Amino acid sequence: MARNLRNRRGSDVEDASNAKVGYETQIKDENGIIHTTTRSLRKINYAEIEKVFDFLEDDQVMDKDETPVDVTSDEHHNNNQKGDDEDDDVDLVSPHENARTNEELTNERNLRKRKAHDPEEDDESFHEEDVDDDEEEEEADEFEDEYLDEDSKDNNRRRRAADRKFVVPDPDDDEEYDEDDEEGDRISHSASSKRLKRANSRRTRSSRHPETPPPVRRALRSRTRHSRTSNEENDDENDNSRNEALTLADEIRELQEDSPIREKRFLRERTKPVNYKLPPPLTASNAEEFIDKNNNALSFHNPSPARRGRGGWNASQNSGPTRRLFPTGGPFGGNDVTTIFGKNTNFYNQVPSAFSDNNNNKLILDSDSSDDEILPLGVTPKTKKENTQKKKKKKPEIADLDPLGVDMNVNFDDIGGLDNYIDQLKEMVALPLLYPELYQNFNITPPRGVLFHGPPGTGKTLMARALAASCSSDERKITFFMRKGADILSKWVGEAERQLRLLFEEAKKHQPSIIFFDEIDGLAPVRSSKQEQIHASIVSTLLALMDGMDNRGQVIVIGATNRPDAVDPALRRPGRFDREFYFPLPDVKARFKILQIQTRKWSSPLSTNFIDKLAFLTKGYGGADLRSLCTEAALISIQRSFPQIYRSNDKLLVDPSKIKVKVSDFMLALKKIVPSSARSTGSSPQPLPELIKPLLADQLNNLKNKLDYMLNIKDTTFQRNTSLLQNFIDYEEYSGEEEEHDKYGGNEDTSSFRSYEFFESMAESQICKPRLLINGPKGNGQQYVGAAILNYLEEFNVQNLDLASLVSESSRTIEAAVVQSFMEAKKRQPSVVFIPNLDIWINTIPENVILVLSGLFRSLQSNEKILLLCLAENLDISEVKNGILSDFAFDKNIFQLHKPSKENITRYFSNLIELLKTKPSDIPMKKRRVKPLPELQKVTSNAAPTNFDENGEPLSEKVVLRRKLKSFQHQDMRLKNVLKIKLSGLMDLFKNRYKRFRKPPIDDAFLVHLFEPETSNDPNWQPAYIKDENMILEVSTGRKFFNMDLDIVEERLWNGYYSEPKQFLKDIELIYRDANTIGDRERVIKASEMFANAQMGIEEISTPDFIQECKATRQRDLERQELFLEDEEKRAAMELEAKEQSQENILQEPDLKDNKANEFGVAAGNQLQAQLQTTINTASIVNNSEVPQPIDTNLYKKEIPAAIPSAVDKEKAVIPEDSGANEEYTTELIQATCTSEITTDDDERARKEPKENEDSLQTQVTEENFSKIDANTNNINHVKEIQSVNKPNSLHETVEKRERSPIPKEVVEPEQGKKSDKELILTPEQIKKVSACLIEHCQNFTVSQLEDVHSSVAKIIWKSKSAWDKTGTVDEIIKFLSE
């Protein structure tokens, strides 16, 4: 329509009659419809016309903004305003326009008629690619000649010629189009630019005359930048163009002239060269598409030029299955692509395709959510019920307001040695709940607070947990709140106090409840002027909450601390902390019970005697230390029984019932464990060592008797740490006080009080100022005696005042430390104030400190059980009686340590005489293993509890693998998405910067035959490109291409094909290698640049953790792919079998068996290959002509030496009878008999060994050669004779296991482990001589000097422990003593 609405010049009234005649003419089309004009037969592309209008409107807006105001145009507008008002439909025509002749118009119409509509080329009638370049130029020149003068015409021609010479087409602009499109663009370039020039000139005229817009001529949008640029440059030039107008007469004359009667017929003129290139053969899908395209040639649903020119014949594949050289499928799509190199595998489908009927839902991932379940037809999904109740507002006040879950597995039975405290806690918690009437009878309130204090690891926290668990039951629940200082403190002012209030309110709501403050010394320290105000406020709040105006109900507060002196004193009073439980280090009985508790659940529990001895050895161990000791002993027993599990990453099959803890395990654990009490400074309580007992045992017994007399320990009726309940259970109540109450002249109650007072005063009067000073020569074992006395007084509270304890804390003075220790001793009586090294102490400590301590002891009553125990060396007695120590009253309680007597020395050195008389064979020594450790079997994956089905039967390995892969599926999908996002930046950069690589080096149209096996197998077909392994071979040149492009890379990326960045980099490298193969310099440079950018970009996004996760995901993808291929093979086999069954009713059994035998899965490939190799190797060994002759067993008996040690098991080792042959002859004989696998290099190395190791070397050669003989002659019939005589199988198995064992091979030494009847060369006279020399030499020696002599003599004897002749040892001892 736009082409027909052309501007005509002038109008002739005479043509009206011709128009009338034209209207009366009737024309019939193909469908029989009558038309009166040819205009109705023309098909109009309204979409293109609308685009032209939009284009013109945009240009008009631009022209209005850019066109300057022209005075002449305004005058012309004013002059023509009158004519516009008279007739709006008639445009103004200049005289110059009227000068156009009818002959010119006729020629122009004839040129337009040559472009008549052709039904077969409907798609070409609306696009500028089919316009003849020469005719368009001629038409444009004639059109411009109508309005321009001669000078303007010449200028326009010169400018167009310069433009065509100057403008060079940009190759990058048309990279994405095919060659046909580029050719069409070049043809239509000049025509479209001319049309745009005419459109611009009309826009200029329309802007000058907005009242009468002329009819719009056809103006196509240019597809190149050059045409648009030319239009913009020529806007100013077209402003001076003449105005044109279309009158009604011109329109009527055009309708008359378009009549088919007057139209001349022109034959089709070919303007394009003939293309004799044969297209690729049509495939099945291409043929259907081609037929459909021809049938629908008259339709308007034609693709755009860019789409139509892309792909050529292969473009029709878009509606069918997509074809690619490389697989692009992933979990996000691309699995419907037919590939040549590789295969698309949708391995993210969890249900095997062989067992699934719905294969179209492969991309639907499995979900564990019930919302994703497929519902039956007609069933609506269940909607979540909204909670209509009013939701409770979550309390944001305290983060840890919820009570702590009580561990019901912990109870009082798990606590040993604290029976007294357990009974007292029960009467605080359980008894008020069970027997409230007992408390109401006396109108009392049970204690509501208790403070646990003592050394670390003594069971304070365990006691609180056991209390909550033991007192809770199904009928009554006790809520347990556990808080630490960090849970309460806050940086906001007043927040900590608010937290405490909320905690007590919550505990009161859930009463009965227990609040346990662990490490309460950090929450409520001692208030002082130097302390921060925040702690003082917290302490005040806690004091008010524990015992304020409000009754807190059945809320029990328990505090635990290691430093009771650091807790504020206001808390340590009845009403707040009613009771204070001191958790001391457990004594022997408590340790015995704790060890029983820790080992009672063992499969092989320890005996009572064993635990008793162990409890005696663990002095100073707390509850936590004893538990750690049992754990270490059990781990050491595991290491001793199964060391293989520490050298293997796989789970091995072990029998736990074979593991038993022995004495050696506990002894090793005792060396490893350091108890908590041993970490502190000063001497810790320890019993007298066994080695020192002969020297100090007698004097220590005398000290114990003296302490019993001083403190009256045995006559004490009740001790604080013992259970009062147990006392009432064991003893009856005293019944004589009712009968004797009249003797005291009062009633029953008064007499009872007087009776108790009398006997208590008599018992206390036996204690009077307990002081004890142990003095003796220097180095006479004072440290052993002091530790042994503290061990004997383990029920006493010990306060150590040694120098290290007093000066360790720089923040306090020595006087303060002394006063604090004394006050603690006074609170917890009976107690001991221990001062070691008193002689050094009085010379170091200032005199005022000694006076302060003496003043404190003076303030004590004489019957208080506070023992002052001091140790000294060579202290002057006069100084004790009359000097500065006289105030301590050591006059009568000074114990003098004497030097060991002759009898003590004789018993002390008796162990050395026993060591001297010990045979080397009786000395326990570490023996090297004779046999290697047995190889433990690996536990299969089915042993895990999750690898069993509902019936408890183990699942197969493949099912277990599928479950494992399914569990990682969501994680792998998430990682692929992360990888896509990280690589998307590089992908966008490559698409925009390197457009040349968006197409492969070889067009897909030339590779269509690769997808058709029938075509490729045709001998008459000679393709230009063929497949060569994983590359495309160009037959003419012999070059090979990978044919990778960026479109494939992008498709792979967004489909989730890549699991790790190196896959993406590998595809970019393929593009780079193809560029090198082509050899184009610019292409190689661009490809190298792209490859470098890819390398650096991937290196930036690659972190070690991310790469590790990507590798794991890649490995799982390979496993999924393997399972998928195996399922596909099974499915194909099932389909084939079903097809055969449909064709044949009865299958032959041999054929069926053969088919089943030939079906192998993917996972069975390695096993099948290994079996085939084994069969081939066996057959080659048997059929080989170089197999050695049968071996003479007698020859081995005579010639092979027997150098195997006696410790080797005779049943599993080969011990030849004769060992007289030399080593060289043996090696040569074995080499001649064995196969070629045994080389002579070992023999040459064996000859170079020293002669000292001939025996061991000969043994190793014999074992290795025997194992090789057996390994290489395993399939020979004559081997049975050798096995029957020499039994080489057992040796071969032993050596083979030794090589496979992770533990290195160890050979026993010949002299170790032998027990012989050989006697020592040691006479009784020599023993007596040594004993006499020792006693004579050590007369008047102190304990320290005796220890020195003992150590030196023990070294001499131990050095010659393996010698049977002790004469030299005796002489060396006597020589040492004489010196």
UniProtKB/Swiss-Prot annotation:
Result after altering residue 460 to A: Increases YTA7 binding to the HTA1 open reading frame outside of S-phase. Increases localization of RTT106 and RSC8 to the HTA1 gene locus. Increases nucleosome occupancy at core histone loci. Decreases transcription of HTA1
Phosphothreonine: residues carrying this PTM: 212, 229
Residue stretches of biased makeup (Basic residues): 192-207, 218-228
Region entry AAA-ATPase, spans: 450-578
Pfam families the record matches: AAA, AAA_lid_3
Region entry Disordered, spans: 1-39, 54-243, 302-330, 375-396, 1233-1274, 1291-1316
UniProt keyword Transmembrane helix, yes or no: no
Acidic residues bias locations: 119-152, 170-184
Compositional bias of kind Basic and acidic residues: 61-78, 97-110, 1244-1254, 1293-1316
InterPro entries xrefs: AAA+_ATPase, AAA_lid_3, ATAD2-like, ATPase_AAA_core, ATPase_AAA_CS, Bromodomain, Bromodomain-like_sf, P-loop_NTPase
PTM note: Phosphorylated by CDK1 and casein kinase II during S-phase, which leads to its eviction from histone gene promoters and promotes histone gene transcription.
GO terms for biological process, alphabetical: CENP-A containing chromatin assembly; chromatin organization; chromatin remodeling; DNA-templated DNA replication; negative regulation of transcription by RNA polymerase II; nucleosome assembly; nucleosome disassembly; positive regulation of invasive growth in response to glucose limitation
Keywords: Acetylation, ATP-binding, Bromodomain, Centromere, Chromosome, Hydrolase, Nucleotide-binding, Nucleus, Phosphoprotein
UniProt cross-references to SMART domains, sorted A to Z: AAA
CDD domains: Bromo_TBP7_like, RecA-like_Yta7-like
Mutagenesis / variant outcome for changing residue 11 to A: Severely decreases phosphorylation, causes a G2/M transition delay, and leads to sensitivity to 6-azauracil (impairs transcriptional elongation)
Effect of residue 445 to A: Severely decreases phosphorylation, causes a G2/M transition delay, and leads to sensitivity to 6-azauracil (impairs transcriptional elongation)
Effect listed in the UniProt record for changing residue 94 to A: Severely decreases phosphorylation, causes a G2/M transition delay, and leads to sensitivity to 6-azauracil (impairs transcriptional elongation)
Record-annotated membrane-spanning stretches: none
Protein location: Chromosome, Centromere; Nucleus; Chromosome
Gene Ontology molecular-function annotations: ATP binding; ATP hydrolysis activity; ATP-dependent chromatin remodeler activity; ATP-dependent histone chaperone activity; chromatin binding; histone binding
Miscellaneous comment as given in the Swiss-Prot or TrEMBL entry: Present with 172 molecules/cell in log phase SD medium.
Quaternary organization: Interacts with CSE4/CENP-A. Interacts with SCM3. Interacts with SPT16. Interacts with POB3. Interacts with the casein kinase II complex subunits CKA1, CKA2, CKB1 and CKB2. Interacts with RNA polymerase II. Interacts (via Bromo domain) with histone H3. Interacts (via Bromo domain) with histone H4.
Family: Belongs to the AAA ATPase family.
Protein name, UniProt field: ATPase histone chaperone YTA7
